[in-house]
Amino acid sequence: SYFVEWIPNNVKTAVCDIPPRGLKMSATFIGNSTAIQELFKRISEQFTAMFRRKAFLHWYTGEGMDEMEFTEAESNMNDLVSEYQQYQDATAEDEGEFDEEEAEGEGQEYA
């Protein structure tokens, strides 16, 4: 699994007091969101199109890489996208359950 249980939040920001020369401030943002899967899908589609044509493959195999390494990398990328999709689907289901609970709670009368 590519996801770890010990990360409680999905966003981290930091501001550096010592900025690069010529700038007043430096900041870093790291976000772990299922939205990244769209980028992975696009890269995977581009890779697959080039790999099917064996574009540039000779440069890598000539240096000792095996074609199977590319197939394995493609499979790993597809697995990663699938896992992000599962987390996205699970989150959407959880939100749906929360909305249902909220709607049920609104129908109750309190004395």
Swiss-Prot record:
Keywords associated with the record: Cytoplasm, Cytoskeleton, GTP-binding, Microtubule, Nucleotide-binding
SUPFAM superfamilies: Tubulin C-terminal domain-like
GO molecular function: GTP binding; GTPase activity; structural constituent of cytoskeleton
Main localization, broad class: cytoplasm
Keyword rRNA-binding in record: no
A Pfam family of this chain: Tubulin_C
Classification via InterPro entries: Beta_tubulin, Tub_FtsZ_C, Tubulin/FtsZ-like_C, Tubulin/FtsZ_2-layer-sand-dom, Tubulin_C
Protein localization: Cytoplasm, Cytoskeleton
GO CC entries: cytoplasm; microtubule
Acidic residues bias locations: 91-111
Location of region: Disordered: 82-111
Cofactor: Mg(2+)
Domain of life, source organism: Eukaryota
Function per UniProt: Tubulin is the major constituent of microtubules, a cylinder consisting of laterally associated linear protofilaments composed of alpha- and beta-tubulin heterodimers. Microtubules grow by the addition of GTP-tubulin dimers to the microtubule end, where a stabilizing cap forms. Below the cap, tubulin dimers are in GDP-bound state, owing to GTPase activity of alpha-tubulin.
Family: Belongs to the tubulin family.
Descriptive protein name: Tubulin beta chain
Gene source species: Lymnaea stagnalis
